[in-house]
Swiss-Prot record:
Main location: cytoplasm
Keyword Transport among record annotations: no
Sorted UniProt keywords: Aminopeptidase, Cytoplasm, Hydrolase, Metal-binding, Metalloprotease, Protease, Zinc
Residue positions binding Zn(2+): 111, 148, 152, 211
Gene name, Swiss-Prot/TrEMBL: mtfA
Its biological purpose: Involved in the modulation of the activity of the glucose-phosphotransferase system (glucose-PTS). Interacts with the transcriptional repressor Mlc, preventing its interaction with DNA and leading to the modulation of expression of genes regulated by Mlc, including ptsG, which encodes the PTS system glucose-specific EIICB component. Shows zinc-dependent metallopeptidase activity.
Free-text remark on how the cofactor is bound: Binds 1 zinc ion per subunit.
Subunit relationships: Interacts with Mlc.
GO molecular function: aminopeptidase activity; metallopeptidase activity; zinc ion binding
GO biological process: proteolysis
Name of this protein: Mlc titration factor A
């Protein structure tokens, strides 16, 4: 265990320097320095509060743990680490895993079987992830397993079960549900027209309100231009709930790159 990762009481500048390598992933590139400092502060708290448990021979290096903590911290960067206090352990498989499950058919008969899962959030229990998909969550592609499962935990704070409505003001619930269901119906209509593979968003979002909230939270943080363009009302709801505006952050970063392009590689010849 490398101790610096867990020392949340260090000066911010020193702490940020130590986290520099962990922060160096595309998903976090748009964050400015104050945002990085807030993110690292929350991630440090989460590393102190949670146990990351590798399974099936997976070896978790300090860098891997730091990056995982940063991914968990991103959705609660402005809310605070306390918003993820509904679990204490994160179980991590090397790759998607097989689980036994029971399901009920239309006649009410219960069947048993197995399915391959990328992740799970257990009510009043741990989060289960796999490192293969965690690595695929480092970019700005619209896919983010960690944010998906964290969103389920945030959803569960509102009554102990996930229904697509996290803790928000009662006066906002009706319009939140209306806009979320509109998004679900719209995604399902697209699936009906072009099929699952041709849909512009993950078809899993059309499953139920809880999955819609979790999937659209992935887009909110890792493909905000797609979510805002497709469902602007949902995007605004999420801005208010998460207290962040990832699209504005992305545009700010892109503008800074345009104003200050990186130097071209030069080659000297003898």
């Amino acid at each position: 265990m490398i101790k610096w990762l867990w020392k949340a009481n260090k000066p911010q500048a020193e702490m940020l320097a130590q986290w520099h390598e962990a922060l160096n992933i595309p998903l976090l590139a748009p964050l400015n320095e104050p945002e990085q400092q807030r993110l690292v502060s929350v991630a440090s708290q989460l590393l102190q509060q949670k146990r990351f448990i590798p399974l099936q021979g997976l070896i978790l290096t300090p860098l891997m743990q730091a990056r995982l903590a940063l991914l968990f911290a991103l959705p609660v960067m402005e809310l605070g680490a306390k918003w993820l206090d509904g679990f204490h352990e994160v179980l991590i498989y090397p790759s998607p895993f097989i689980v036994a499950e029971d399901w009920q058919d239309d006649l009410g008969l219960v069947h048993s079987g197995q399915s391959v899962q990328s992740g799970q959030s257990w009510e009043q229990g741990p989060i289960v992830l796999n490192w293969q998909d965690i690595q695929d969550s480092f970019d700005l592609s619209g896919f983010n397993l960690v944010i998906h499962e964290a969103a389920h935990k945030l959803d569960m704070r509102n009554g102990g079960h996930s229904n697509g409505v996290p803790p928000i003001a009662m006066r906002d619930v009706a319009v939140w549900e209306h806009d979320l269901h509109h998004a679900m119906d719209n995604i399902q209509d697209e699936i009906d027209m072009v099929g699952v593979e041709g849909a512009s968003m993950d078809a899993y979002a059309a499953s139920n309100p809880a999955e819609c909230f979790a999937v659209l939270s992935e887009y909110f943080f890792s493909a905000p231009e797609l979510l805002e363009g497709r469902f602007p009302a949902v995007y605004q709801h999420f801005c208010r709930f998460y207290r962040q505006d990832p699209l504005a952050r992305l545009k700010r970063w892109e503008n800074s790159l345009a104003d200050n392009p990186p130097p071209e590689n030069t080659h000297s010849h003898r």
